[in-house]
């Protein structure tokens, strides 16, 4: 999207009015002709690109101190807010997955191409470059609404916040979809069939499905997870089973030791226990996110843990806030590193 002269003039006027900079300074630098000011101090950029993986290299900084973060597509966090001192320049790179639809697989198509938002408390961008990265590794995510790229604030899936932990060369391909179970994820061609066709040898595939398997019996649940694992392996991918994030449902003693919190369904199927046992029997890596999130919620207690979920905003103790998704994504990233599921050089 090349700026018209009128838009360029408006952009320069807005920058001069909003930036705490010396006279004549453009805090966004030069060469950003795919970008326009939003009116809130941020910079929105659009690139007409086909679906695929792309490297983004950005030089942050300016004549005055700044702090810049980058998000993109459907509210994906791509680069954590990064401070720069006056006169400092910092180069950062990451890889982004561009797909259609851009968010949830069964959701709205969104905008074709790549959209980036350069914001933060004081955005300072000197240059921006986007180049094809056809050989990048994709880290696929299979899951439900607790994982997906949620389109509307304040709902946020942990998969939406995971990209900030990855360096250039690995892109999160979040194919999680709200409301899906092991049954529906396999049945809908827009879901697993699409993921399966895109997997290349060595691509990690994280699988977290449980919240919506409310009436799935144990044998069927195990069979569906086994099918997912085996079909990923058949493509040369590296499946990783992930136990579900807990619900914020406290006992009187301040623990989460109950079926609602720990995802035991109406048939008495203990999903986390089934996943742990299956991972052991199949020799599949396991990220025990149930145990990790349980420990975090219990550590915070009944009151402080509300901030991790949408308890206050929506009376929702299942779906995470931006803060909760951010913390849970960090737990997943730490496990990817600790278990060697991604090379250490790929993680920030």
Regions found by a protein language model. Give the residues of each.
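Solvent-exposed loop/turn segments at secondary-structure junctions
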Residues: 62-64, 145-149, 177-183, 211-216, ...
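Secretory targeting and sorting signals
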Residues: 1-23
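Serine-esterase "nucleophile elbow" of acetyl-processing enzymes
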Residues: 116, 122-178, 191-205
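Compositionally biased, intrinsically disordered or flexible polar/acidic segments
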Residues: 20, 24-152
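Alpha-helical scaffolding segments of alpha/beta enzyme cores, especially the outer helices
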Residues: 194, 223, 227-230, 234, ...
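Structural recognition of the beta-strand scaffold that forms the well-ordered cores
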Residues: 138-143, 147-148, 171-176, 203-209, ...
């Amino acid at each position: 999207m090349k700026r018209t002269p009128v838009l360029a003039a408006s952009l320069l006027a807005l920058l001069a009015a909003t930036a705490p900079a010396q006279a004549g300074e453009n805090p966004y630098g030069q060469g950003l002709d795919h970008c326009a000011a939003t009116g809130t101090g941020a910079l929105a950029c659009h690139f007409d690109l086909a679906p695929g993986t792309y490297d983004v290299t950005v030089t942050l900084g300016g004549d005055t101190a700044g702090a810049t973060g980058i998000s993109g597509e459907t509210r994906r966090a791509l680069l954590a807010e990064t401070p720069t001192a006056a006169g400092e320049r910092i180069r950062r790179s990451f890889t982004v997955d561009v797909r259609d639809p851009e968010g949830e697989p069964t959701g709205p198509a969104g905008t074709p191409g790549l959209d980036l938002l350069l914001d933060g408390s004081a955005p300072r961008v000197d240059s921006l470059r986007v180049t094809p990265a056809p050989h990048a590794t994709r880290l696929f995510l299979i899951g439900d609404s607790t994982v997906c790229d949620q389109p509307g604030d304040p709902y946020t899936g942990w998969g939406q916040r995971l990209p900030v932990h990855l360096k250039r060369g690995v892109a999160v391909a979040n194919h999680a979809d709200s409301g899906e179970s092991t049954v529906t994820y396999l049945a809908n061609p827009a879901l697993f069939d699409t993921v399966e066709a895109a997997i290349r040898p060595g691509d990690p595939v994280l699988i977290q499905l449980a919240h919506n398997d409310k009436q799935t019996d144990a044998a069927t649940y195990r069979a569906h997870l086994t099918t997912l694992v085996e079909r990923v392996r058949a493509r040369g991918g590296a499946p990783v089973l992930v136990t579900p994030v807990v619900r914020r449902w406290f006992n009187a003693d301040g623990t989460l030791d109950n079926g609602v919190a720990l995802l035991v369904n109406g048939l008495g199927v203990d999903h986390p226990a089934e996943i742990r046992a299956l991972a052991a029997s199949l020799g599949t890596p396991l990220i025990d996110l149930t145990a990790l999130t349980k420990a975090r919620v219990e550590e915070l207690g009944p009151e402080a843990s509300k901030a991790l979920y949408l308890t206050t905003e929506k009376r929702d103790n299942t779906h995470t806030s931006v803060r909760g998704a951010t913390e849970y994504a960090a737990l997943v990233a730490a496990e990817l590193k600790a278990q060697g599921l991604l090379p250490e050089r790929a993680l920030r």
